């Protein structure tokens, strides 16, 4: 005889919902001031020209223009927005 009641399989059936992180506007895409370019945890990508960074490391455009992904140095990336000429 069992001393404990068997555990149901529903105990394991949980998962957290996705956080909707990632790139929202890609290279070459036109953005307006205030548009979110990247949602991220930590600074995987750093802010470049005409780009701001929020409390939660969200990168957003400060001016209207085109998104450009660049290298900051050997092992860091940055994203900039360049106004249309």
From Swiss-Prot:
One of its GO terms (cellular component) is cytosolic large ribosomal subunit. Keywords: Ribonucleoprotein, Ribosomal protein. The keyword Ribosomal protein applies. It comes from the Bacteria. Pfam families: Ribosomal_L27 (PF01016). One of its GO terms (molecular function) is structural constituent of ribosome. InterPro entries: Ribosomal_bL27 (IPR001684), Ribosomal_bL27_CS (IPR018261). One of its GO terms (biological process) is translation. Belongs to the bacterial ribosomal protein bL27 family. HAMAP family: Ribosomal_bL27. This is Large ribosomal subunit protein bL27. The gene is rpmA.
């Amino acid at each position: 005889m069992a001393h404990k009641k068997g555990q149901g399989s529903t105990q394991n059936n949980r998962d957290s919902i996705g956080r909707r992180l990632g790139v929202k506007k890609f290279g070459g895409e036109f953005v307006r001031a205030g548009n979110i370019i990247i949602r991220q945890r930590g600074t995987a990508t750093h802010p470049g020209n005409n780009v701001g960074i929020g409390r939660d490391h969200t990168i957003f455009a400060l001016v209207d223009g085109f998104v450009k992904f660049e290298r900051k140095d050997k092992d860091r990336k940055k994203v900039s927005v360049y106004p249309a000429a």
